[in-house]
Amino acid sequence: DTDLRVAADSLAGDLDQQITLSGSVELRQRELLITSPQVELEVDGVLRFSQGLQLQQPGVIMRGREARWQRAALNQGNAESGDVLEIADAEVVLAENGLRATAEKLARNADGQLLIDGGEFTYCAPGDDGWALSAQQLSLEAQTNQVITRGAVLRIKSVPVLYLPYLKLPMSAGDAAKT
């Protein structure tokens, strides 16, 4: 089922321009659940989350201060082709491998690839600052199970110890052989 199901406490607006959903808004598509206090639905297929959102899928949780979801194929009957989700001030947790990341800007495309600008990631537990890799750009590629960084700095106990202009790592913390 590729339909996007929407629930909200209230709905206001004009179908020819923009509809605003507010109060405990939930958007569901297959195993995807997005919750937000308010969502603006625009006629061109863009959904805006100006008051933040939380996205949940099996093994993935994302949160952000605001977001924009371009539903490119909404009018073409193919629900995920070309979809792009952009989140500002994002936090991501991948439960399967323990990866945690923060980002000034995060973009997620239809292939599940996460592109992070001004971000940091670690496999350490919350509250543990054992190590983190901060980077100008991070790419988490689910299909190849790799993290690619550009302009990275390795921090141990929050102290920068190594600059890495380019680095490719396995996404799974247990796959140390590739590291």
Please report, for each region that a protein language model flagged, where it lies by residue.
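Structural signature for solvent-exposed beta-strand/loop edge elements and short helix-capping sites
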Residues: D1-T179
